[in-house]
Amino acid sequence: QTEGEFGSNGAVEVAQRLAAENGLYMPFQYGNPANPRAHYEGTAEEIVRDCPEVDVFVAGLGTGGTLMGSSRRLKEHRADIRVIACEPLQGDPVSGLRSLDDGFVPPILDLARLDRKLLVGNRDAILMTRRLAAEEGIFAGVSSGAVIHTCARVAARMTRGTVVGIVCDGGWKYLSSGLWTDDVDAVEDRVDNGIFW
């Protein structure tokens, strides 16, 4: 068991220790080369096929797999595509994403592959998650709200071009949080301190 104060970093450390002590296999998505390979062969290949004009690619900084695999394939498609990581502000957790300032850098993450990191706060992620549902009918989770908020920031600074962002978590995980119905301050506190599924 881990103390809640150690968050997902503590859980990863305990899982690695238990696997090592007991001779168990741990898929370890943060360090497994199959993770970025799946995005190289799948996610990015779909983007190249369906949106070859992409100029900017935005994904949340979680395990690093989406960013690493997609960036490699997209830069092969066109070297000038910008790859941007959406990262939560330190001390302002966004469910599903991780701040590198919290001390854990996924082994598969190569920061040199990123053109930029943009920070996003939990409140902005929640507000965009609500907008996605209300305005676009997209029932996404908070990390997806963070990514689309980042996409909007990037697009606002562009005079032309195409931004692609990854909506990777579902709203069903947050049904008990009151994300779409309760006061934003109350939801922000619940999302900061909870696991919903």
State where each predicted segment sits.
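Surface-exposed amphipathic alpha-helices with a cationic face
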Residues: 71-78, 155
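Active-site-adjacent helical/loop segments in soluble small-molecule enzymes
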Residues: 112-158, 180
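Short acidic, glycine/serine/threonine-rich loops at helix termini
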Residues: 38-40, 69-73, 95-99, 175-179
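Phosphate-binding loop/pocket of nucleotide- and phosphate-handling active sites
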Residues: 152-197
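Residues at the starts of beta-strands that form the adenosine-phosphate
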Residues: 80-82, 162
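Short glycine/serine/threonine-rich phosphate/pyrophosphate-binding segments
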Residues: 60-71, 143-151, 174
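Small/polar-residue-rich loop-to-helix segments that shape phosphate-bearing ligand pockets
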Residues: 1-56, 86-133
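Short beta-strand segments
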Residues: 27-30, 60-62, 85-87, 164-168
